[in-house]
């Protein structure tokens, strides 16, 4: 079991056979060492008790019922007066049955077996370290090829004959022609290695530091050569350089973590605790078993068959032994990752077996569903919706969720302010939803951040802190700019809300996890709080007013109306028809009074800034007044000038949407400038 005070993290990696043996073996009081599972049986069909040395053996994994052995005898657990702490007849200790949740066993494999995760998963770690093609290694593991194993200090057949100096070669049709059956078996056992044992020998001979040095030298040589002019050769060199970098990183990782490469070849196969692969009796007396039990049984059956072939019958043909070794390798592959080599193994009902990989990976796997996704106190969950009026560091919490999360704080506030005499009265006031409850809840929430999390939490921005505010409804309101960090959108996504309780957690939430303090991606440094999806659509709608100016062309398809007979107004009429505003506040006020639409063109008086006028642009029309003043009308602006050609006013042709967008950007820039001035 994992002690939460001693172990702050959980890491999955390779372990040595000695470590597996230390985990799985135990010494019972009579001095006997148990832990090896040798029989493929589970429960006896008559007594319904676990078989000895089987997959549910009580000697190996502990008693099914606390303090009761396989014989039915009972002892008080932890009673020092009891002389015997185990049953001498069946060998079962009188201990707590919870040991069956973490006590492991092991299967001693007759032949080494390659761990399929490190062979078949991409990138293949074994292929990277050995610098061999994956297909050749697969042929070697599954006994399709062989590996020449010369013995030092002795002249061998493979050394004397130059035609057999290849490291990996097919011998099925060449070497047997020179030997009798018995002579070839002796020669093969001495000279040829195949299966996972051949891979293990090569991995054991590796020096990781020499691999790093040689890979670095080759990488530098490839970098000095430069482009060859042949595109295919250049791509080949780039792929080789990338491979060398991955190989060096892998070797450094093995050195840093004190892992030996040969540990990727299994000699001892761990057996999971029985409670993690249970057999359950349902209605009608039928039994339901975990698929892993059937896969373990298959491994034990084939391993015992191989043991019998090697021990009981010395005249067994080598081909039969190699075939059985291949079956053991395939059985272990199916146990670890069913279907990784092609068609998955199925049961009698054509249902695919769930292997160990299927149990732990995915949304319904052991980690995400049981360990990461389990329910905790002071947490809630709801659908997220957009809250465009919220600040970047705020989120909207529904009243129903907020009162449950902060109920203890509200109770304390009611009692401190003498509004409730005890906890029971305070809870009754909360159930009745009195107005004073919401006032105290508002006070509590002002100084207490909350954490929002969206699964899967793939990086640190998957959980951020926010300042909560009360909102109506039953959904969590979120600012759309923070969605990219969560990889969320508003099509029904759900998020979990957590309340940090300790002062350390609250300080971390305020200083490190607030959303407005995580504007850059921690991986590449690019801005992560950028408009996406709904915000881009909103900005498009906001600024999608007419950009064609005041000129109308009956042959321009953009100007065509739904009715072909509708009259296209003249330039003068459009100019006089569109309203004029002195400032943006008047224009927005007219929009709120529904006198104009969001995309209706209008004329807005602008500051006397000549930069908006193109130097070569000429007016479309010029209108003169009786006093000598005149209006120069352009496509997107007009200028009011005096008789002396002095500029009185400049009006730009825009829409309410453009005005709103400009004001938001202006306020953001001013706020940023003020913040920078405060910092300096």
UniProtKB/Swiss-Prot annotation:
This is DNA-directed RNA polymerase subunit beta'. The gene is rpoC1. Mg(2+) binds at residues 489, 491, 493. Binds 1 Mg(2+) ion per subunit. DNA-dependent RNA polymerase catalyzes the transcription of DNA into RNA using the four ribonucleoside triphosphates as substrates. GO terms for biological process: DNA-templated transcription. Belongs to the RNA polymerase beta' chain family. RpoC1 subfamily. It comes from Arabis hirsuta. The lineage of its organism: Eukaryota, Viridiplantae, Streptophyta, Embryophyta, Tracheophyta. Gene3D superfamilies: 1.10.40.90, 2.40.40.20, RNA polymerase II, clamp domain (4.10.860.120), RNA polymerase Rpb1, domain 3 (1.10.274.100). Its cofactor is Mg(2+); Zn(2+).
């Amino acid at each position: 079991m994992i002690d939460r005070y001693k172990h702050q993290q959980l890491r999955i990696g390779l372990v040595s056979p000695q470590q597996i043996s230390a985990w799985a073996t135990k010494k019972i009081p009579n001095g006997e060492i148990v832990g090896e599972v040798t029989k493929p049986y589970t429960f006896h069909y008559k007594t319904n008790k676990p078989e000895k040395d089987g997959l549910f053996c009580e000697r190996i994994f502990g008693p099914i019922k606390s303090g009761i052995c396989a014989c039915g005898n009972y002892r008080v657990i932890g009673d020092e007066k009891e002389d015997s702490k185990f049953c001498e007849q069946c060998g079962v200790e009188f201990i707590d049955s919870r040991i069956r949740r973490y006590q492991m066993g092991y299967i001693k494999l007759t032949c080494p077996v390659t761990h399929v995760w490190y062979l078949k998963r991409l990138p293949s770690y074994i292929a990277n370290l050995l610098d061999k093609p994956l297909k050749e290694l697969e042929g070697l593991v599954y006994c399709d090829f062989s590996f020449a194993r010369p013995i030092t200090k002795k002249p061998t057949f493979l050394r004397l004959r130059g035609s057999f100096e290849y490291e990996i070669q097919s011998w099925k049709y060449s070497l047997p022609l020179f030997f009798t059956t018995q002579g070839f078996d002796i020669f093969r056992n001495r000279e040829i290695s195949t299966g996972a044992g051949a891979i293990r020998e090569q991995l054991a001979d590796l020096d990781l530091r020499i691999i790093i040095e040689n890979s670095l030298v080759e990488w530098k040589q490839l970098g000095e050569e430069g482009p060859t002019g042949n595109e295919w050769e250049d791509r080949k060199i780039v792929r080789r350089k990338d491979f060398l970098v991955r190989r060096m990183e892998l070797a450094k990782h093995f050195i840093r973590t004190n892992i030996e490469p040969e540990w990727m070849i299994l000699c001892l196969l761990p057996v999971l605790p029985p409670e993690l692969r249970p057999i359950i009796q349902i209605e009608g007396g039928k039994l339901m078993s975990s698929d892993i039990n059937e896969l373990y049984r298959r491994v034990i059956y084939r391993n015992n068959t191989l043991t019998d072939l090697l021990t009981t019958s010395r005249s067994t043909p080598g081909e039969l032994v190699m075939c059985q070794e291949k079956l053991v390798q395939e059985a272990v592959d199916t146990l670890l990752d069913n279907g990784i080599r092609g068609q998955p193994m199925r049961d009698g009902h054509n249902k695919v077996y769930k292997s160990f990989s299927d149990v732990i990976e995915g949304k319904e796997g052991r980690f995400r569903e049981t360990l990461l996704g389990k329910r905790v106190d002071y947490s809630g969950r709801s659908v997220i919706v957009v809250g465009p009026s919220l600040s970047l560091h705020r989120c909207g919490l529904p009243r129903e969720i907020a009162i449950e999360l902060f109920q203890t704080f509200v109770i304390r506030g009611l009692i401190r302010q003498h509004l409730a005499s005890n906890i029971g009265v305070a809870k009754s006031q909360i159930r009745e939803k009195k107005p004073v409850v919401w006032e105290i809840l508002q006070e509590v929430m002002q100084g207490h951040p909350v954490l929002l999390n969206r699964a899967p939490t793939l990086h640190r921005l998957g959980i951020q802190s926010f300042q909560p505010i009360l909102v109506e409804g039953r959904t969590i309101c979120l600012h759309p700019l923070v969605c990219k960090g969560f990889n969320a959108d508003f099509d029904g996504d759900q998020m979990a809300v957590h309340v940090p309780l300790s002062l350390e957690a609250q300080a971390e939430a305020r200083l490190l996890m607030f959303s407005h303090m995580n504007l850059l991606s921690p991986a590449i440094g690019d801005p992560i709080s950028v408009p996406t999806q709904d915000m881009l659509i909103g900005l498009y709608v906001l600024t999608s007013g007419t950009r064609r100016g005041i000129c109308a062309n009956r042959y321009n398809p953009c100007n065509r109306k739904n009715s072909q007979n509708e009259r296209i107004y003249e330039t003068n009429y459009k100019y006089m028809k569109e309203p004029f505003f002195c400032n943006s506040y008047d224009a927005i006020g007219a929009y709120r009074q529904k006198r104009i639409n969001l995309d209706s063109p209008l004329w807005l008086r602008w500051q006397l800034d000549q930069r908006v006028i193109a130097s070569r642009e000429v007016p479309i029309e010029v209108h003169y007044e009786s006093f000598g003043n005149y209006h120069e009308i352009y496509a997107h602006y007009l200028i009011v000038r005096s008789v002396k050609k002095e500029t009185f006013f400049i009006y730009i042709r825009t829409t309410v949407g453009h005005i709103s967008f400009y004001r938001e950007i202006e306020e953001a820039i001013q706020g940023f400038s003020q913040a920078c001035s405060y910092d300096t």
